[in-house]
């Protein structure tokens, strides 16, 4: 299993980006979460089964939804000891 963390900056809050991310992740059967951060970015943690899933997810994130404007995506690989497990993908408020 591959565990990735993303920090997305740009016009990503108040434009349905979290809902878009949740839809993409659920369609791909990913597990994890998406949430707004106080600094205006969005954080995503996602668990993938294959590297191909990672590439597809990242390509969809780069485009965002029609109301968002993605300026930057920071990516971090989480190690196997990441303390949280997820049964699905959800939005944290």
Curated annotation (Swiss-Prot):
This protein's species is: Borreliella afzelii (strain PKo) (Borrelia afzelii)
Keyword Hydrolase found: yes
**Gene that codes for this?**
acyP
Looking at the record, the residues that make up the Acylphosphatase-like domain are: 3-93
Annotated EC: 3.6.1.7
Which terms does the record give in the GO molecular function aspect? acylphosphatase activity
Listed A to Z, the keywords are: Hydrolase, Plasmid
Q: Which domain of life is it from?
A: Bacteria
Q: State the active site.
A: 18, 36
Similarity comment:
Belongs to the acylphosphatase family.
PROSITE patterns from the xrefs? ACYLPHOSPHATASE_1, ACYLPHOSPHATASE_3
Question: Lineage in the entry?
Answer: Bacteria, Pseudomonadati, Spirochaetota, Spirochaetia, Spirochaetales
Looking up NCBIfam families in the UniProt record yields: PRK14432.1 (NF011006)
Task: Tell me what reaction this enzyme catalyses.
Answer: an acyl phosphate + H2O = a carboxylate + phosphate + H(+)
> What is the name listed in the Swiss-Prot or TrEMBL entry for this protein?
Acylphosphatase
Keyword Hydrolase, does the record have it? Answer: yes
């Amino acid at each position: 299993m591959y565990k990735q963390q993303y920090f997305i900056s740009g016009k990503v809050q108040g434009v349905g980006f979290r809902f878009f991310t949740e839809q993409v992740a659920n369609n791909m059967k990913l597990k994890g979460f998406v949430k707004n951060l106080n600094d205006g970015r969005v954080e995503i943690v996602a668990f993938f089964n294959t590297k191909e899933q990672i590439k597809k997810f990242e390509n969809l994130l780069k485009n965002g939804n029609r109301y968002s404007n993605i300026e930057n995506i920071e990516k971090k690989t989480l190690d196997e000891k990441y303390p949280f497990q997820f049964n699905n993908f959800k939005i944290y408020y």
